[in-house]
Amino acid sequence: AYGTGIPAWRLAFAVLARRMTPDEVYAWLQRLKVQRRDGERIAAAVTVAPRLVERLGGDSLEPADVVAAADPFAPDAPLFAMALEKRPELDDYFTRLRNVRLEVSGSDLAELGLGESPEVGEILAELRRRKLNGQLDGRESELAAARELISAA
């Protein structure tokens, strides 16, 4: 439904393993000779999904907070979290938020005078956070915010 491309068997394994400890999950997947990468995703889904549900169940989060919680473990853990508990935030993540992209890039920041440094990534991350939260609505607003962030640095 969300176009994640996750093989159905991987989610099925996560469901079967949902009551196991992380060590039990890894041992079980090794006995089944599941490829390491798939096994890591299944184990992460089993261990992270309940925490993700708990995190999203607290105070209302901004869209960027939802993305920050879900992205590192996507798509398996957020999808499995939805199977555990229907969360509107995760529905929004899969239908809209995970596809939010900036219209500016590091090259644009260089044209604004920012040299190569870790600051480029930090500014791009802040711009995406603002865009996710609805504070930026296109290339011009992204460039204006980038100028502001560069001058404040």
Predicted regions and their residues:
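Conserved, hydrophobic alpha-helical core segments of structured domains
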Residues: 1-86
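Charged substrate- and nucleic-acid-binding regions of tRNA-handling and nucleotidyl-transfer enzymes
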Residues: 63, 75-153
